């Protein structure tokens, strides 16, 4: 069982011609292997994210219910509406059970494998602009999630040329709350100026 390992680059059936696994099967397999989460990073899109988060929320409903009930019990003990012999011991036991339940939660990491234009996303002039490099972009918080949505949306609406593309200036503009990872064989070498 792999308890300390999390895949940060996973394609689902929403990565056409590359991924074939369903979201549910990926999550189930990761959980079966003892993983605490996975990052869904489909090529140039976030089409599977809603399905991913909904499925993980469904799988997490048991532990979340336990946590809610335990917190309610603690509040009742503190308010005096729940009877028990040793309040401090009971609260400590409830808090320990909360930690156990939290350790059962599966973490859905939202991301995208983005295509980055060699020059700018607005240039669409033949072969140099057809290719570029790839980056894995992960949201580490709500701000990052919103910035990732902006990057992917702009890649489709402004940068599309053979595929949805972003560029360095967009990454610099919307970097807050994001973690950016390079892919060895298809990435531009890491540069300090990529994201400040």
Protein language model regions, located:
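Phosphodiester-processing cores and adjacent nucleic acid-binding clamps
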Residues: 1-187, 191
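Hydrophobic alpha-helical segments, chiefly the membrane-spanning helices
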Residues: 195-196
């Amino acid at each position: 069982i792999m308890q300390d390992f999390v895949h940060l680059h996973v394609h689902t059936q929403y990565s056409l011609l590359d991924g074939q696994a369903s979201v549910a099967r990926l999550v189930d397999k990761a959980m079966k292997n003892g993983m605490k989460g996975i990052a869904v990073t489909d090529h140039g899109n976030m089409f599977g994210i809603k399905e991913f988060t909904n499925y993980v929320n469904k799988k997490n409903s048991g532990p979340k219910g336990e946590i809610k009930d335990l917190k309610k019990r603690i509040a009742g003990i503190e308010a005096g509406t729940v009877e028990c012999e040793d309040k401090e011991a009971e609260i400590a036991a409830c808090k320990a059970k909360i930690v156990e339940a939290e350790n059962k939660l599966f973490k859905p990491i939202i991301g995208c494998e983005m295509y980055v234009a060699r020059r700018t996303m607005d240039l669409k002039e033949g072969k140099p602009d057809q290719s570029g490099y790839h980056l894995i972009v992960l949201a580490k918080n709500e701000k990052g999630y919103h910035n990732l949505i902006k990057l992917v949306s702009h890649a489709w609406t402004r940068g599309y040329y053979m595929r949805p593309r972003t560029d360095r200036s967009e990454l610099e503009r919307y970097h807050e709350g994001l973690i950016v990872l390079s892919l060895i064989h298809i990435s531009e070498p890491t540069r300090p100026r990529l994201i400040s």
